[in-house]
């Protein structure tokens, strides 16, 4: 009886191990480690160490995103909902800042006019490096309802580079939360130390 239980347990363990191996192999493409590092087949210990360094730096940046509020129109109300206690963005490390010198993310929320474009560019230039931009709403993405107005910029990506576009008029706070989570995934895939090593 005892030997039959041991045999059944061993078979169950083997099945579990084989299904876990299949799951891990099917999730990651060939040659990419399961940790998500983009270094393919590191050939030296230095490359491996730099890949782990990138993982640690990306984890720190991903866990402490400090956005700058740049509300220009009605999308700013949804950005305020996003910052309110209902969504509790502090658990993701999102802490709003009022100064561009302390922020590493800017939410462009609303219609960007031609007069506001130089101010937006100046604020973007004042942010320290490793900076990201989330364009929020139809007006910031491409002009929206005011696309054909003479005084409206047809998308903030004509002035500053945009990382994530959040569609909607206005987008909900949940959509903005999804955009922040997508930005965190993008930060996770960064590989600055590895690219520096390859130069």
Swiss-Prot record:
It is an enzyme of class 7 (translocase). Keywords: 4Fe-4S, Electron transport, Iron, Iron-sulfur, Metal-binding, Mitochondrion, NAD, Oxidoreductase, Respiratory chain, Transit peptide, Translocase, Transport, Ubiquinone. PROSITE patterns: COMPLEX1_20K. One of its GO terms (biological process) is aerobic respiration. GO terms for cellular component: mitochondrion; respiratory chain complex I. Its cofactor is [4Fe-4S] cluster. Binds 1 [4Fe-4S] cluster. NCBIfam families: nuoB_fam, PRK06411.1. This is Probable NADH dehydrogenase [ubiquinone] iron-sulfur protein 7, mitochondrial. It comes from Caenorhabditis elegans. The lineage of its organism: Eukaryota, Metazoa, Ecdysozoa, Nematoda, Chromadorea. The gene is nduf-7.
């Amino acid at each position: 009886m005892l030997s039959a239980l041991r045999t059944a347990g061993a078979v169950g363990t083997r099945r579990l191990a084989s299904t876990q191996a299949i799951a891990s192999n099917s999730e990651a493409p060939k040659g990419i480690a399961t940790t998500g590092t983009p270094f393919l087949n590191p050939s030296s210990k230095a490359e491996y160490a730099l890949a782990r360094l990138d993982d640690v730096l990306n984890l720190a940046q991903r866990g402490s995103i400090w956005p700058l509020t740049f509300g220009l129109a009605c999308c700013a109300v949804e950005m305020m909902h996003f910052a309110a206690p209902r969504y509790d963005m502090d658990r993701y490390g999102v802490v709003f800042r009022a100064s561009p010198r302390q922020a590493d993310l800017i939410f462009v929320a609303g219609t960007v006019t031609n007069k506001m474009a130089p101010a937006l560019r100046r604020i973007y230039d004042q942010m320290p490096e490793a900076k990201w931009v989330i364009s929020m709403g139809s007006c910031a993405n491409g002009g929206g309802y005011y696309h054909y107005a003479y005084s409206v910029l047809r998308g903030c990506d004509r002035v500053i580079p945009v990382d994530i576009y959040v569609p909607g008029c206005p987008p909900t706070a949940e959509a903005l939360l999804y955009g922040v989570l997508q930005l965190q995934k993008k930060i996770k895939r960064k590989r600055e130390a590895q690219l520096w090593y390859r130069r």
